[in-house]
Amino acid sequence: MIAWRLPLCVLLVASVESHLGALGPKNVSQKDAEFERTYADDVNSELVNIYTFNHTVTRNRTEGVRVSVNVLNKQKGAPLLFVVRQKEAVVSFQVPLILRGLYQRKYLYQKVERTLCQPPTKNESEIQFFYVDVSTLSPVNTTYQLRVNRVDNFVLRTGELFTFNTTAAQPQYFKYEFPDGVDSVIVKVTSKKAFPCSVISIQDVLCPVYDLDNNVAFIGMYQTMTKKAAITVQRKDFPSNSFYVVVVVKTEDQACGGSLPFYPFVEDEPVDQGHRQKTLSVLVSQAVTSEAYVGGMLFCLGIFLSFYLLTVLLACWENWRQRKKTLLLAIDRACPESGHARVLADSFPGSAPYEGYNYGSFENGSGSTDGLVESAGSGDLSYSYQDRSFDAVGPRPRLDSMSSVEEDDYDTLTDIDSDKNVIRTKQYLCVADLARKDKRVLRKKYQIYFWNIATIAVFYALPVVQLVITYQTVVNVTGNQDICYYNFLCAHPLGNLSAFNNILSNLGYILLGLLFLLIILQREINHNRALLRNDLYALECGIPKHFGLFYAMGTALMMEGLLSACYHVCPNYTNFQFDTSFMYMIAGLCMLKLYQKRHPDINASAYSAYACLAIVIFFSVLGVVFGKGNTAFWIVFSVIHIISTLLLSTQLYYMGRWKLDSGIFRRILHVLYTDCIRQCSGPLYTDRMVLLVMGNIINWSLAAYGLIMRPNDFASYLLAIGICNLLLYFAFYIIMKLRSGERIKLIPLLCIVCTSVVWGFALFFFFQGLSTWQKTPAESREHNRDCILLDFFDDHDIWHFLSSIAMFGSFLVLLTLDDDLDTVQRDKIYVF
C-alpha cells in the first residue's frame, strides 16, 4: 500500500519545486540609485531589480519625487511590474499600462510617469529611503528605462502661474498650502487646446493619491475640462490646511464632447494611443473674503428696499395731492356760484344710494350723465371720445341677492341667453356691454386666481426644494462638480451651497413681488372706501376694478424668485423646468389681465386658466425628457400648437359665442360660402381680426421653426412662444388704446419707457451665456467668466437684478395703463 504511494509523493514534490522555480526568480539584483540619472536594464522571470533611493526631507519644505518608466520592448504579454515602497505608502503599476475607456475599450501606454506621495515628517530634517522593485513573468529579457527626478515646483504659490505637460499615463499633481489669513482660494486651470479631455481633482494630502483616469473620481472634488476649469476650495474642508491639485488626461474625449477614436474590432486587443499630451497652466488665487459676502448682501437688499422707499414717497405725495383736491372740492361746494357739483351717486337728482356694487350703466341716465361730464370736463376728459347719449342705456335690475355666488353663477345675467348673444356680437362694443354681471360674483371669481396659485405654489415648491437639496448633497458627498452647471469662475460657496451669489440675486423677485402685492392691497382698500362713499367714479366709471389677477401675478413673481433660486442651487438639464414653470404662469396671467380689462364678464375662470397652464408645463416636462432630437414629439407638439391657436382665435373673435360640437364643420362651411363665395365681405370685427391674423402668423412660424430646427432647449422655446404672444397682445392693446382716442398718463408712460430700457439691458446680460447645459459640463465651462460686479456677482446675477425690476415695472404698467379712464363712463370706453 505504502510502496505505490512513495513514487507519487516524490513526483508531487518535484512538480511543486519546478513550479516554484518558474514562479519565483532565482536572482535579486539590488543597487543604490541616484536622482536625475537614467537606468537602462533588463529583467525577466528569474531576475528582480531593486533600486534604493534616499533623500533628505525637511519639515518646512515639501519636495516632489517623480518616477519615469519607459519599456522599450513592445510585447503583448507579461508586463513589467513596478513597486515603489516608501515609509508610509506603496505605489505599484504595470508597464505597458492598460487603461479602460467606454465600452471596456483598452488603451496601452509604454511610457509611464508617477509622482510619489510624500509622507510628512515631525523632525526638523530626516533622511528617508524608498525602493523601486522591477519584476516580470516574461521568460525573455525585457529592456526598460528608469529615472527618478525631483520636482522643484511641486508646491504651488498664490498668484503664480505654473505651466506643465501631462498625458493619461503621466498624470501630474501639485501641493498647495493655505497661507495665514486665507480661508478660501480658487484653483484655475487653463489650456490653449480643448482636447485631449482632462480631469481636475482637488484631494486631501493623504496617501495614496488617486491620479489615474480609472480612479481619480474616488475621492475629493473633480470636474472635466477642455480649455477652462475652476474649483473653489475652502480651508475648513482640509484639516491639514493643504491639498493636492491633481491633473489627469482621460483616455477618451467623449466626456468633454469629443468623438470616440477608431477602435479595431479585435477582441481583448489593446490600442496604443500614441502621444495624447496636453499643456496646461494652473493658477491659485485668493477667493473673495467675508467682507465681499456682506457687501453683496447689503447691495442686494439696498437696491430692492429702495423701491419700497420710493413707493412710500409716491404714496405720501399722492395722499397729499388727494387731500388737496378734496379740500378744493369742499371749497367749491361751499361756494354755490362755482357751478361744480359733488361727484357722489346720492348727489344726482332722483338717484338712490348705491346698492349692490353693480356697474356698467347709471340708474338715472340723464341726471347722472350731466353731473359727471360737468365735474370731469376740466381735466381728465379733455381728449375726445365719441359723443354718445346714455339715455339709451336704461336701468338694469341689480343682482344683489346674497343667496349664492358660486362658480355656476358667474355667467348668470338677468337677460335671457339670446340677449347675451345680441350684446356680445355687436360690431362696436363698449366696456359697459361686458361689465353687466354682479360685482360680488366677479370679485369671488377672480379671487380664486390668487387662492389657486397660492395652493399650486405650496405643492409645487416643497418637492422642488427637497429635490435641489438632494442634488446639492450629492455634489458635496461625491465631489462630482459635473452634476451642476455653475459659472465656476464666479461661484461663491456659503455653507453647503456651492453658488450662493446666484441664489442671493433672486431675492429681487421675492421682494418686488411682495411690494407689488402691497401696492395692490392699498389700491383695493382705496377702491373699497370709494365704493362705501358711493363715489360715482368708482361705481360707474373707468375699467372695472378686479384685483384677484393682480394678486396672482404678484404671487407668481415671488414664486419665480423662489424657484429660480432653487434651480440655481444646482442648475442642470433636468431641473431647468423649475426656473421656467412660473414664467409660463406670469406670461399667461398677464395676457389674461390684459383681456380682463376690457372683457370682465367673459374672461376665463381660474380653473380653466390654470388647467391650460398645467398642460403647458406638462408639455415642458415631456419636451425635456423626450424632445431632444425626437421628430415624432415635435410633429405632435406642432400640430397641437396650431390647433390650439385656431381654437383660441375663434373663441376670442366671437367673444365666446360659438360652440365646439358635431355641427362645427357645417357652420364653418356655411360661413365660408356666405362670406367668401356667395358674397365677398370683410370681417365684421376688423380690429380683432387683425390681432388674430398676426397672432396666427407668429404662432404658425414658431411651430414651423420648432418642427424644422428642433431646439434642444424645449423649455426656453415654449417660454418664447408665451412671451411673443404676450408682447403682441400688449402692443396691440396700446395701439388700439391710442387709436380709440384714449391717452397714456405720465406715470404709466414713464413705466413703459423705463421698463423697456431695463428689459433691453437685462436681455443683454441674459444672452452672455456664462454656462449652458445644452453642452457637456467641460464645454460649458469654456463660457465661464469672472465676476463683474463687486467681485461677487456675474452677468447672470445682473440679469436676475434687472429682470426682476423689469417684471415689476411691467406689472406696474398693467396696473396703471388705464388710469386715464377712471373718470370716463364705461359706455364710452371701447372694447378691443
Curated annotation (Swiss-Prot):
One of its GO terms (biological process) is RNA transport. It is a multi-pass membrane protein. Pfam families: SID-1_RNA_chan. GO terms for molecular function: AP-1 adaptor complex binding; AP-2 adaptor complex binding; DNA binding; double-stranded RNA binding; nucleic acid transmembrane transporter activity. InterPro entries: SID1_TM_fam. Widely expressed, including in the liver, brain and kidney (at protein level). GO terms for cellular component: lysosomal membrane; lysosome; plasma membrane. Glycans are attached at N27, N54, N60, N123, N141, N165, N476, N496, N572, N603. Glycosylated. Residues 315-447, 521-546, 627-631, 710-715, 768-796 are cytoplasmic. Keywords: Cell membrane, DNA-binding, Glycoprotein, Lysosome, Membrane, Phosphoprotein, RNA-binding, Signal, Transmembrane, Transmembrane helix, Transport. It is found in: Lysosome membrane; Cell membrane. Changing Y830S: No effect on lysosomal localization, nor on RNA uptake by lysosomes. The modification Phosphoserine is found at S401, S403, S404. The chain crosses the membrane at residues 294-314, 448-468, 500-520, 547-567, 606-626, 632-652, 689-709, 716-736, 747-767, 797-817. Disruption phenotype: Knockout mice demonstrate a statistically significant departure from Mendel's law, but there is no significant differences in their weights or appearance as compared to wild-type controls as newborns. At 5 weeks of age, male mice show reduced weight and size as compared to control animals. This phenotype is not observed in females. Mutant animals exhibit increased fasting glucose levels and impaired glucose tolerance, probably due to impaired insulin granule exocytosis by pancreatic islet cells. Residues 1-18 form the signal peptide. Its main location: membrane. The keyword Repressor does not apply. Residues 19-293, 469-499, 568-605, 653-688, 737-746, 818-832 are extracellular. Mediates the translocation of RNA and DNA across the lysosomal membrane during RNA and DNA autophagy (RDA), a process in which RNA and DNA is directly imported into lysosomes in an ATP-dependent manner, and degraded. Involved in the uptake of single-stranded oligonucleotides by living cells, a process called gymnosis. In vitro, mediates the uptake of linear DNA more efficiently than that of circular DNA, but exhibits similar uptake efficacy toward RNA and DNA. Binds long double-stranded RNA (dsRNA) (500 - 700 base pairs), but not dsRNA shorter than 100 bp. Interacts with adapter protein complex 1 (AP-1) and AP-2, but not AP-3 and AP-4. Interacts with LAMP2. Belongs to the SID1 family. This is SID1 transmembrane family member 2. It comes from Mus musculus. The gene is Sidt2.
